[in-house]
């Protein structure tokens, strides 16, 4: 069992999943993970499926050099976005794994929220490409480690409503004006 960078507040109401050394681009996966952070589990799964079908885009905020603009990014209050299909598929598989862990623990999957998701760089894999004049250049891949913690959302209890709202304190000047209005109307 690997270590997680963070432990959840309530261990009995949360579940974890991780994927080490995934052969998927780190930068794309980081942006996709930031998009689903703090989403309910069902919404995150719908979002990732929509990204695969190019119905919704992933906003690129940090690693956005050379990323084109798209109209779908407006809903995220940004201009740049892409549809990283492979990253979305890997994260969707990880969320399915975490959901299965939640079912095993007896938690309600419909009330789960993506509490923590983190993407770290893994060790680069080295290949080579052949260039002109007998030279060789590196052809590196940038895999990543991903970890997810889902937490069951607590029921929010609303405050009791008072019958009379607290009266606003009025200044002497305003009280004087109100008295004058009352006298004029009579």
Curated annotation (Swiss-Prot):
Keywords: Ribonucleoprotein, Ribosomal protein
Disulfide bonds: none
InterPro entries given in the database record: Ribosomal_uL22, Ribosomal_uL22_CS, Ribosomal_uL22_euk/arc, Ribosomal_uL22_sf
Gene Ontology cellular-component terms listed: cytosolic large ribosomal subunit
SUPFAM superfamilies in alphabetical order: Ribosomal protein L22 (SSF54843)
Basic and acidic residues composition-biased segments: 177-186
Top-rank lineage group of the source organism: Eukaryota
Region (Disordered): 161-186
GO terms (BP aspect): cytoplasmic translation
Gene Ontology MF term list: structural constituent of ribosome
PANTHER family: 60S RIBOSOMAL PROTEIN L17
UniProt similarity note: Belongs to the universal ribosomal protein uL22 family.
NCBIfam families in the cross-refs: PRK04223.1, uL22_arch_euk
Identification of the protein by name: Large ribosomal subunit protein uL22
GN (gene name): RpL17
């Amino acid at each position: 069992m690997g270590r997680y960078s963070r432990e959840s507040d309530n261990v009995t109401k949360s579940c974890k999943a991780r994927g080490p050394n995934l052969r998927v681009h780190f930068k794309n996966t980081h942006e996709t993970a930031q998009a689903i952070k703090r989403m309910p589990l069902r919404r995150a799964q719908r979002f990732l499926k929509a990204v695969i079908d190019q119905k919704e885009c992933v906003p690129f905020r940090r690693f956005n050099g050379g990323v084109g603009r798209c109209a779908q990014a407006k809903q995220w209050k940004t201009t740049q976005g892409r549809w990283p299909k492979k990253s979305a598929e890997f994260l969707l598989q990880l969320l399915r794994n975490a959901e299965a862990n939640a079912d095993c623990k007896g938690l309600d999957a419909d009330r789960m929220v993506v509490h923590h998701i983190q993407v770290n760089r893994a060790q680069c894999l080295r290949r080579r490409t052949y260039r002109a004049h007998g030279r060789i250049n590196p052809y590196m891949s940038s895999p990543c480690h991903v970890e997810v913690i889902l937490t069951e959302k607590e029921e929010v209890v609303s405050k009791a409503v008072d019958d009379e709202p607290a009266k606003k304190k009025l200044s002497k000047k305003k009280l004087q004006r109100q008295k004058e209005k009352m006298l004029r109307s009579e």
